[in-house]
Regions:
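Short, solvent-exposed loop/beta-turn-alpha elements that line the ligand-binding surface or hinge
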Residues: 84-96, 139-143, 166-170, 189-208, ...
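Conserved C-terminal helix/tail region of periplasmic/extracytoplasmic solute-binding proteins
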Residues: 314-316, 326-333, 347-401
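Glycine-centered hinge/linker elements that transmit conformational signals in sensory
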Residues: 151-158, 195-225
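Conserved N-terminal structural module of periplasmic/extracytoplasmic solute-binding proteins
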Residues: 1-72, 77, 91-92, 136, ...
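Extracytoplasmic/periplasmic solute-binding protein
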Residues: 106-115, 120, 146-198, 239
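Extracytoplasmic/periplasmic substrate-recognition and gating elements
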Residues: 29, 35, 108, 211, ...
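Hinge/lid segment of periplasmic solute-binding proteins
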Residues: 66-121, 148, 264-273, 335-340, ...
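Short helix-initiation/N-cap motifs at beta->coil->alpha
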Residues: 40-49, 68-69, 143-149, 222-236
Length: 401
């Protein structure tokens, strides 16, 4: 028999011992000779615990998190075992391409085998949108709209007496995926190059988007709020759109039934507007990696665990449900068919874009981003502001590469 250690970050129910032990029991019913001990990490101290364990030669066999840790950090440091043999042709066909591309490095070595995902989106107060006759600009089945339709919706709400339609919040990095996504999507810009080596916010498409948002009445650059504050202002009716949204927000029932504002207006989740009709959403991907501790038996046992939990057709649905997120495999189907909100939201998974959070200099880029938005909001020329952003972010990327 073999014993392996799994360390998991709090990814939905994967941070709950009762839930995880249930999954381990299912694994042991099929593989009784592999003993799995689990340790639960948090996001405050987890990275330090893992790094200390790596330095001390006592890293866990398995870890559950996302590509920015498994591929871009520990994978790049050479402490992970490649999982190329798990990535069969069938797996590559079944798993979303945007997820697959995030799980390997530029050499093609896979350091993550994914289980679940989510996508961040935006939301509108559909009651108010209908009130001003702007629902004509929205494809309610696909949850998509054009950039022109978005701007016409903002204009209709503004002229309808809603002075604060939306906010480009920039007091800090909280919720910054929303401001990146609205700016990148409007005219087809990107946040980084495809190879994830440099930041590209100074492209003509991005400059046009930032300038348009700055010049649009009803959209205000607000250096006093971050994403969480924006959500509060959207829920209480101050704002009619939110750029910081996801399934957790859509399902939240703290102040009213899920899907309703505090006053009972309908909250409708939307993909970010595009000129092309092809939205690219930011998101999260979570799965498993294996630390190479030099013990082939443990690596093999850890791979057996991954295959059972994340690839076995009879098991994978329960593994994903435990996460409260969405499957990365198309074959799993709609696991939330009996939950209208979750089922409808699953449409957004097909819109997941490039997972660029694995670009070097990421921490610096995030700080430089909200600083750039603040400078634009206070009147600095957009081209000057984005040049400072890319200069500083790319200097950090070069230093880390």
């Amino acid at each position: 028999s073999t014993s392996i250690k799994l360390w998991t970050y709090p990814i939905g129910g994967w941070g709950n011992d009762e839930t995880v032990q249930g999954l381990v029991s299912s694994f042991n019913a099929k593989y009784p000779d592999i003993k799995v001990t689990v340790e639960y990490l948090d996001y405050t101290n987890g990275d330090d615990q893992v790094n200390t364990a790596i330095e001390g030669g006592s890293a866990p066999d398995l870890v559950m998190e996302g590509p920015e840790r498994l591929v871009a950090n520990w994978g790049a440091k050479g402490v992970m075992a490649p999982l190329n043999d798990l990535w069969t042709d069938d797996a590559k066909k079944d798993i979303y391409a945007s997820v697959e591309s995030a799980c390997h490095n530029e050499k093609g070595d896979y350091y993550e085998y994914p289980l679940c995902m989510t996508a961040h989106c935006m939301a509108v107060n559909m009651t108010k949108v209908k009130e001003v006759g702007a629902d004509q600009y929205i494809d309610t089945d696909k949850h998509t709209w054009s950039t022109d339709g978005f701007l016409k919706t903002v204009d209709a709400l503004y002229k309808g007496g809603y002075e604060n339609v939306a906010a480009i919040y920039c007091s800090g990095q909280g919720g910054d995926q929303g401001t990146r996504a609205i700016i990148n999507n409007m005219y087809g810009g990107t946040f980084t190059d495809a190879a994830h080596t440099k930041y590209t916010a100074d492209s003509a498409e991005n400059i046009k988007a930032i300038q348009t948002l700055h010049d649009t009445k009803g959209i205000n650059f607000d250096a006093s709020i971050a994403g969480g504050d924006e959500i509060t202002l959207f829920r209480n009716g101050t704002l009619q759109m939110a750029f910081c949204w996801n399934i957790a927000q859509q399902a939240n029932s703290d102040n009213n039934d899920a899907g309703l504002t505090n006053d009972g207006d309908e909250i409708f989740p939307m993909a970010f507007p595009t000129a092309s009709g092809d939205p690219k959403l930011c998101g999260g991907i979570w799965g498993f990696g294996i630390f190479d501790n030099g013990d082939e038996a443990k690596i093999k046992a850890a791979k057996t665990f991954i295959e059972f939990i994340a690839a076995d057709p009879a098991q994978v649905k329960d593994s994903v449900l435990a996460s409260t997120y969405f499957p990365v495999r198309t074959s799993v189907g709609d696991i939330y068919a009996d939950n209208e909100i979750m089922s409808e939201y699953s449409k957004f998974m097909a819109y997941l874009g490039d997972y660029y959070q694995i670009t070097p200099g990421w921490a610096t880029a995030r700080t430089e981003w909200w600083n750039m938005l603040q400078r634009v909001g206070s009147g600095e020329d957009v081209e000057t502001a984005v040049k400072t952003f890319v200069d500083n972010a790319n200097a950090a990327a070069a230093a880390e590469a």
